[in-house]
Regions:
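N-terminal hydrophobic membrane-entry segments
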Residues: 1-208
Length: 208
């Protein structure tokens, strides 16, 4: 149990008090609470959400209400908080650039094979956004932001461009990159929507 500031009459023979810092959610993020204790969980995610469970605040499981920026009194021994950025973040498919968030550390330029048999490397910059009320769904389904990148974004973007490259010549990518970029943006936006992730833009970088 968490005791907030104030005076308390406690029996030291039965209780032990430990002072710990409050959980801080920085600006630009929300916190998704995963509680390992609490009232028996009752899924309130609805019939449309079939890839996880969401519960009311205070129940055992992933809370449907996120924590907004500020300090929150939580017992971190029985609760875990996953931070989810709510600002637009750029994920760089290149070894040249790594975002300050660190989610794209393991992403590299895509190695593609064109219709006319040329192999080339393609840099892609994917901009995504997760709404604050969608964050609990994302965490319930995938567990963490890093899993969003590794298990969803990387295969979707990589497979699209690998399949697309086999339909075009290398010259098509070099001379009509804006068309290839628009096609990719439309596909990725539709694919990520089913994961409650918004694809803001898909940008093509260097082609080498």
């Amino acid at each position: 149990q968490v005791l907030l500031s104030g005076s308390w009459n406690l029996n030291p023979w039965f209780v032990q008090v430990e002072q710990v810092p409050m959980t801080e959610i920085p600006i630009g993020y929300v916190g998704v609470v995963i509680s390992f204790v609490g009232t028996a969980s009752e899924d309130i995610s609805g019939a449309a959400f079939t890839h996880g469970h969401l519960v009311e605040t205070g129940h055992k499981g992933v809370w449907v209400e996120p924590l907004y920026p500020g300090k929150h009194p939580l017992n971190t021994r029985v609760m875990k908080v996953e931070l989810v950025p709510t600002t637009n973040i750029v994920l760089n498919f290149t070894a040249r650039i790594t975002g300050g968030h660190g989610y794209d550390t393991n992403l590299t330029a895509l190695k593609l094979l064109s219709f006319d048999g040329f192999s080339f490397d393609l840099e892609v910059f994917q901009v995504i956004h997760i709404g604050s009320m969608d964050a609990p769904k994302v965490i319930s389904r995938l567990g963490s932001m890093q899993n969003v990148v590794d298990q969803v974004l990387r295969p979707i973007v990589g497979n699209y461009f690998r399949n697309s490259a086999q339909e075009y010549t290398i010259l098509d990518f070099l001379t009509a990159r804006s068309e290839r970029q628009a096609e990719a943006a439309e596909y990725v936006k539709a694919a990520l929507r089913s994961y409650d992730v918004q694809a803001v833009d898909t940008l093509i970088g260097l082609i080498t």
